[in-house]
UniProtKB/Swiss-Prot annotation:
Biased composition (Acidic residues): 239-252
Superkingdom of the organism of origin: Eukaryota
Keywords from the UniProt entry: Acetylation, Cytoplasm, Isopeptide bond, Nucleus, Proteasome, Ubl conjugation
Name of this chain's protein: Proteasome subunit alpha type-1-B
Gene that this sequence comes from: PAF2
Keyword check for Endoplasmic reticulum: no
Membership in a protein family: Belongs to the peptidase T1A family.
Gene Ontology, cellular component aspect: cytosol; nucleus; plasmodesma; proteasome complex; proteasome core complex, alpha-subunit complex
Site of covalent link Glycyl lysine isopeptide (Lys-Gly) (interchain with G-Cter in ubiquitin): 51
Keyword presence, NAD: no
UniProt-listed PROSITE patterns: PROTEASOME_ALPHA_1, PROTEASOME_ALPHA_2
GO BP term, example: ubiquitin-dependent protein catabolic process
Organism: Arabidopsis thaliana (Mouse-ear cress)
Knocked-out gene: effects: Do not show arsenic tolerance phenotype.
Location of this chain's protein in the cell: Cytoplasm; Nucleus
Length: 277
């Protein structure tokens, strides 16, 4: 049986119980630039890779403000993400106007999942080709959700979506146990380091990433480029210091005629620096 017999309509099931159009939408998420979210007890940090179509164009926005206590990062079709973020903003405003209180994050995520799920049941609609990391803060604490094109949603301590996101997930899995008690500064640093993991050797600069923060008594806002670059500089100096220390230890042991050996060792350390992952 050929797949193209069952992937022409989103409401057509394959004999193996699969909806190929929904799976294609989920694959679109993997093609987008990486987006990362982390949360502690009091803060949520969203970060993404800035991707431009060419050197002459500006990058597309991948993080949107929904309300003072909610933000969303997307991976996949940016146009779909823009439409859904506008829907989320409308839901938040309507709730605030009606009940005079902020919209709980979990309730907004359910509304968003229901909207996405309807597109998997109508033959004249297509699934949204975008994944959303929804971060927010309400009376029950900080939350981070992932909304899938299939209409499913999951809550995470930290998560990454998009292209090359597996490298970021590996980094987050190594450190996720400490995120709950982390400070805002530590969350920002871990988010940027996770972004670096997705670049696969490309030099990390503040212009390549966007970072947003929200927390207790701290409305949603974006970090400026200077603040991001300062964080990058703090952990970019660490490999250099280790390299200098290695050269200093090698010099007393080296023979007078082997002065070049220490330099070769230093360049070897540079080759295996975290930037090359």
């Amino acid at each position: 049986m050929f797949r193209n017999q069952y992937d022409t309509d989103v409401t057509t099931w394959s004999p193996t119980g699969r909806l190929f159009q929904v799976e294609y939408a989920m694959e679109a998420v993997k093609q987008g630039s990486a987006a990362i979210g982390l949360r502690s007890r009091s803060h949520v940090v969203l970060a993404c890779v800035n991707k431009a179509q060419s050197e002459l164009s500006s990058h597309q926005r991948k993080i949107f403000k929904v309300d003072d206590h909610i933000g969303v990062a997307i991976a996949g079709l940016t146009a779909d993400g823009r439409v859904l973020s506008r829907y989320m903003r409308s839901e938040s405003i309507n709730h605030s106007f009606t009940y005079e209180s902020p919209l709980p994050v979990g309730r907004l995520v359910v509304h968003l999942a229901d909207k996405a799920q309807v597109c998997t049941q109508r033959s004249w609609k297509r699934p949204y080709g975008v994944g959303l990391l929804v971060g927010g803060l309400d009376e029950s604490g900080a939350h981070l959700y992932y909304n899938c094109p299939s209409g499913n949603y999951f809550e995470y301590q930290a998560f990454a979506i998009g292209s090359r996101s597996q490298a970021a997930k590996t980094y987050l899995e190594r450190k996720f146990e400490s995120f709950q008690e982390s400070s805002k500064e530590d969350l920002i640093k871990d988010a940027i380091m996770a972004i670096r993991e997705t670049l696969q050797g490309e030099t990390l600069k503040s212009s390549l990433c966007t970072v947003s923060v929200l927390g207790v008594d701290e409305p949603f806002h974006f970090l400026d480029q200077e603040s991001i670059q300062k964080v990058i500089d703090t952990f970019e100096k660490v490999p250099e210091e280790e390299e200098d220390a290695g050269e200093g230890e090698a010099e007393p042991e080296a023979a007078p005629g082997a002065a070049g050996t220490g330099e070769q060792g230093g360049s070897g350390d540079q080759d295996v620096a975290p930037m090359e992952i």
